[in-house]
Amino acid sequence: MIGKEVTLQDFTLELSELQPEVQPVDLFCEEELPAEHQETEEEPAIDRTPYKVVAPCGCCEVKLRIFVKATDFGIRTLQNLLIEELQLLCPECRGNCKHGGS
């Protein structure tokens, strides 16, 4: 390189040195793609069982019935909520309560 500015004549590319390392890649390889129906994994159907839940009203203690379809985990979670955190209200007691706890 002579001078302060670089010119293309100052660079010499030796592509023959890279030839052994660089190999062409066949883009049409022997890999087979699965069919579309095999490509999408179907989620297993969730097994839900119908249940009748009987719980007392949180105010007047009258028996209330609700019917749900739930998984084993879901029905156990509902049971824990009804025992510890949640109280159902009958229609009569609902009218006497203020919504939102205020």
UniProtKB/Swiss-Prot annotation:
Keywords: Activator, DNA-binding, Early protein, G1/S host cell cycle checkpoint dysregulation by virus, Host cytoplasm, Host nucleus, Host-virus interaction, Inhibition of host innate immune response by virus, Inhibition of host interferon signaling pathway by virus, Interferon antiviral system evasion, Metal-binding, Modulation of host cell cycle by virus, Oncogene, Transcription, Transcription regulation, Viral immunoevasion, Zinc, Zinc-finger
Renumbered ranges of motif Nuclear export signal: 75-83
SUPFAM superfamilies in UniProt: E7 C-terminal domain-like
Region (E7 terminal domain): 1-49
Compartments where found: Host cytoplasm; Host nucleus
Post-translational modification as stated in the protein's UniProt record: Highly phosphorylated.
Sequence motif LXCXE motif, location on chain: 27-31
GO BP term, example: symbiont-mediated suppression of host innate immune response
InterPro entries on file: Papilloma_E7
Zinc finger (unnamed): 57-93
Major site of localization recorded for this protein: host cell
Pfam families referenced in this protein's UniProt entry, alphabetically: E7
GO CC field: host cell cytoplasm; host cell nucleus
Gene Ontology terms, MF aspect: DNA binding; DNA-binding transcription factor activity; protein domain specific binding; zinc ion binding
Family of the protein in this entry: Belongs to the papillomaviridae E7 protein family.
Record's function text: Plays a role in viral genome replication by driving entry of quiescent cells into the cell cycle. Stimulation of progression from G1 to S phase allows the virus to efficiently use the cellular DNA replicating machinery to achieve viral genome replication. E7 protein has both transforming and trans-activating activities. Induces the disassembly of the E2F1 transcription factor from RB1, with subsequent transcriptional activation of E2F1-regulated S-phase genes. Interferes with host histone deacetylation mediated by HDAC1 and HDAC2, leading to transcription activation.
Self-association state and partner proteins as the record states: Homodimer. Homooligomer. Interacts with host RB1; this interaction induces dissociation of RB1-E2F1 complex thereby disrupting RB1 activity. Interacts with host EP300; this interaction represses EP300 transcriptional activity. Interacts with protein E2; this interaction inhibits E7 oncogenic activity. Interacts with host TMEM173/STING; this interaction impairs the ability of TMEM173/STING to sense cytosolic DNA and promote the production of type I interferon (IFN-alpha and IFN-beta).
Notes concerning its domains: The E7 terminal domain is an intrinsically disordered domain, whose flexibility and conformational transitions confer target adaptability to the oncoprotein. It allows adaptation to a variety of protein targets and exposes the PEST degradation sequence that regulates its turnover in the cell.
Protein name per the record: Protein E7
Organism listed in the record: Human papillomavirus 25
Gene behind this protein: E7
